[in-house]
Amino acid sequence: MMFAGTKAAFNTFAGPQEFGRWYSARRDRSRACEAWIEQHDQILGYCDCCEAVVPLGVASGATFDHHPSLREGLICPQGLSGRARLVFRVVKWIGVVADGRLLDLILYEDLTPLRKAISRLPGVRAHCSLYHAEETSSGTAIVVNGNWTTHQDITASSYPDAAADIVMHCDVLEHIANYRAALAENLRILKPGGLLLFTAPFFVQQPQTQTLASQNSAGEITHLIPYPEYHADPVRGQILAYYRFGWSLLDDLRGAGFSGARALVEFDVFSGLTSNNNPYMDTGNMPPLMVVAMK
């Protein structure tokens, strides 16, 4: 029911052809809006977390050449970026339509503004964690920056089977060398009919996922591009990206046992939900996108 409702409430796509037809009618208008936004330090927009029209800070520090990343920018007063506010909007909507049921949500994230916002949602019981180190056992209590949290390995968590109505992670999967093992683990801990929701670098121009680096059984890493790609990480400072995902990621989800894997795209300029603002439309631009799949 939640999955069917999510498809009805948001624009979702099973493959590049239907997305391409939909996006071609919106691409130029979206880019014009983003060009206007990047000329300002802040804009006014509606935030689902703040439940009000609020100032959204345009720049976060992340840039493409001199263009600010609007995926990591457009930050609301509670600290949620455009990417995080998209996630919050979808989870909030699912909580509203859950008919009063308390939803168990496993979130592979902690100590962030998004985690705090999700934990305040009525009808959602959040179980949050961080990845600490390979030698740490999943389920172990750890201290990060003076705060207690729990270590969980997304490929081998300590959660029991069918523990969650929703499993969620945000820009985690690209950092997992064996990401298919993570998808299998996500499936294991979901209840039947439960939803997997996640963000990741998903490039709608790519039919296939691009592998940037690989890791052998001994843990040795081979870089497959001239300049390895690292992303900021709150625990380790920076972390290697192994993949730039394409539409084949949806096939991986179906192969793992999920049904109805789709890309959810939510353009809403008034709410600060835009593309990442990368000027290279054929290689680096990403729409405001999440992946959704059902067990």
Which role fits each region the language model picked out?
Residues 100-217, 247-253, 289-294:
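Conserved SAM-binding loop
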Residues 3-4:
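Extended, low-complexity, charged intrinsically disordered regions
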